[in-house]
């Protein structure tokens, strides 16, 4: 909105970082593109830090092509159409105040539609209601191979916390993963990726 205010969420980036660490430990060539989070990323070889959805989209394009894309970032669907040059003051805006929004790039959909589409594309879906219905719809509409779905409530502390519980949704399979550390979730996802490629 301006140099002080922004549209964001409570996502810590921890789940994506844990997946990147796990894959790197399995000797995969990993690049982590991560948003503006306060997270220690020691040990990760290739890290690209970005501030916006547009920068993240550009970084993904520049990083490719790749064999696997794991889109765990909680990217905002919208951004202000224009950023104010100075802090917006109450005295200067009058009543009522409207914030005009425009859509951000759909990074997951763009990856799935690319000519050099990765062999495996995994998206994430954080939902507040109708988890399975919305996640299955996202799997279909985005064109990805898997969706890792988790329900976000005020009580769950999934977003920004150290634990998670998810459902891994494929076209013909759904695997419910019990609540555990995000490191544990990452290891399970990585194990399933290895199974997918090596059988």
Locate the predicted segments by residue.
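Glycine-rich phosphate/adenylate-binding loop
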Residues: 116, 130-199
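Glycine-rich phosphate/diphosphate-binding loop of Rossmann-like nucleotide-binding domains
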Residues: 1-52
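Short, glycine/charged-enriched secondary-structure capping and boundary segments
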Residues: 4-8, 45-48, 83-87, 136-138, ...
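Generic structural "secondary-structure junction" signal
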Residues: 3-9, 41, 77-80, 90, ...
